[in-house]
Amino acid sequence: MGSPMARHLASKGHDVVVYNRNTEKAKQWVEKNGGSFALTPREVGEQCEIVMVCVGNDNDVRNVVLGADGVLAGLKNGTVLVDHTTASATLARELSAACTAKSVGFIDAPVSGGQAGAENGALTVMCGCDDQKVFDRLRPVFDAYAKACQRMGDAGAGQLTKMVNQICIAGVVSGLAEALNFAMRAGLDADQVVEVISKGAAQSWQMENRSKTMVRDQFEFGFAAEWMRKDLGICFDEAKNSGADLTMTKLVDALYARVIEMGGARWDTSSLMKLLTHPPK
């Protein structure tokens, strides 16, 4: 995700400094897109007015941002840290407090739209930020790779909104998988069914972008099942704090656990279909 997002920034005229734990990947990115690379996250902070982090989970964010060689150690007064990772709201508030102590702005800004959205510069960015002025300053920058961007509230609100997004996706994908399997077993042309029902209330992004590959048993792409389980785990932790009932989402999470047991950890989230068309014995 981070690579195409950075590429869009460079193509829009921003002076980009990249860091990757694999320095060779950073070098290759620079050779292809311009800019420069740093050897540590701290070096990025020392060279940039705005630093954007896009990694895997809470621990990854802490490793990149905090500590002697972390981004925050290099950031100066008046700079801004943006975390595009899908992480916990608790971490977002923790980072916001750490940034405030250094007079650094902070935005938790998880994204939706998948790899295709990143490649096409059409992501949706959900932001949490304690300072409206900081968000307003970053809004034009997000336009480089986003089709929509909204401040949802103070620090943590962006991550909470992403949790809502993932809960919705879990329900929609599971329903779509069962519906398509039902259509196929009933002897219907699944593509034709989708063509018709997508014009009505059943239409969804998942139907538009995943139905054809689902009925053709194609899942070696997209957002991995193991990452979806990570995201849903964050949702469950937050639900314990708020008292929200996620009974149905937990059922879908259990299905993803079965997909992973089948060897589908890296399969797209639409691979729930596999449980129905090729049920494990």
Tell where the protein language model's regions lie, with residue ranges.
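NAD(P)+-binding Rossmann beta1-loop-alpha1 motif at the extreme N-terminus of oxidoreductases
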Residues: M1-V53, T79, H84-T85, Q115-A118
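Hydrophobic residues within alpha-helices
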Residues: M5-L9, L95, F182
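Hydrophobic beta-strand scaffold residues
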Residues: V16, F37, C99, G105-I107, ...
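Rossmann-fold NAD(P) dinucleotide-binding segment
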Residues: P41-G105
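Rossmann-fold dinucleotide-binding core
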Residues: T86-I167
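Active-site-proximal catalytic alpha-helix in oxidoreductases
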Residues: G121-C127, Q150, D154-A186, I197-N209, ...
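Interdomain hinge/lid region at the active-site interface
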Residues: A155, Q159, Q203-T269, H278-K281
